[in-house]
Amino acid sequence: MSASTTELRRDAEVIGWVGFAHLLSHFFQLILAPLFPLIKDEFGVGYAALGLMVSVMYTVSGVSQTMAGFVVDRYGARRVLLFGIVAFSLALLLTGLATSYWMLLAIALLAGVGNSVFHPADFAILNAKVNPKRLGYAFSTHGIGGNFGWLVAPVFSIGISTAYGWRAATIAAGVLGLLIAAVVATRTALSDAEPDAGAQRGKALGAPGPGLRQDLRTLLSGPVLKCFGFFTFYSMALIGLQTFSVSGTTALYGAPLVTASGALTGFLFGGIVGIVAGGVAAAHSSRHNLVAASGMAIGAALTLLLASGALPLWSLAGVMTLIGFFTFSTQPSRDILVRAATPPGATGKVYGFVYSGLDLGGSLSPLLFGWMLDRHMPQWVFGAAALFMLATVAMVLTLRPRRAAEVAPSCPSGR
């Protein structure tokens, strides 16, 4: 077997397992939401209280994600990834055993810690292990895995809860996660991705590790902050549409629930196809900022069309599908731009920091969009989403990555 074939197989295995880990994290995130009506009745709480659980999880995840990145750079991505899978699995298992709402709230803290590790660990592994010419495909597979996790979770939780109750569904998800963690622990393809390659090279040369001041200077540099801003606005736009587009289209267009739900489904499936197309574009383009800006600008224009309230009902699903396609197609190029803003030895902390912008946007967006719907402004569900998309365009077009010499791929020259 030739060296190139061996490398391709190794890259494919790494990409596959990291994509599967991302699928698992999104699967975990959406296990509970379909069960809320059952949990609400059993514990005698309202949806606001259950929503607080979700906010607690994402707040803890956002705060912990940057710290998880530091741990990844220090101790290695594989160990941290395993910790996250086990922690999130235990949180779901304990949810099935909870006897009060306050226990659920405490368990949400553990779930947030578990959720925080996936992005910094995943991207540290991909950047360290995969040939740079395949990173577009790697990041695309990573994004597709996450979307499929969201699609599978409701089927899993509703299917098991219908037959055996909601507790059985969460316990089954937790046990499944622990079994998967045991399998991931045996995957040697991930084992030499730790610690961060840049940090290791520095140690090998006898160079001291960067101090806290240098770490903060890295995280607060212009390129990294613009990546953080992109992720925050991106999350506010897309989480707003995912969460409130059904309510927005029913209020603005008088659309039947089945039509509005079909439009959301189109958005999600368009996103999956968009990530695939975006991976191909990222693999064949060096102008990643233009790829990302174009996708978000087209998505914003289509979303403004929805905000007009002038579209016929039959077109809603098609327009939402196109919005999903163009906005999600930016993900692989977006992740390569983060790589370009990352100095050697800082992969985990930078990806952890910028991806915490997703959690920040996910925490703020429901409050804003819900407020607009409560005040009978459904057009602004789409108008605000479009404005946030345009903000991402501004972030990415003004982004100036580090010099090429500073972002040379952290892999042997033969790769």
Task: Label the model's feature ranges.
Residues 74-85, 283-296:
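Cytoplasmic membrane-interface "Motif A"-like loop-to-helix N-cap segments
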Residues 288-334:
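C-terminal transmembrane helical hairpin of 12-TM major facilitator-type secondary transporters
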Residues 107-146:
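Cytoplasmic helix-loop-helix junction between adjacent transmembrane helices
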Residues 63-99:
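Conserved MFS/SLC helix-loop-helix module at the cytosolic interface between two early adjacent transmembrane helices
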Residues 2-9, 194-226:
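Juxtamembrane intracellular "pre-TM" segments in multi-pass secondary transporters
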Residues 32-33, 223-268, 272:
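Extracytoplasmic gate region of multi-pass secondary transporters
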Residues 64-76, 275-287, 373-374:
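Helix-to-loop junctions at the C-terminal end of transmembrane segments
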Residues 142-190:
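Helix-loop-helix hairpin linking two adjacent transmembrane segments in secondary transporters
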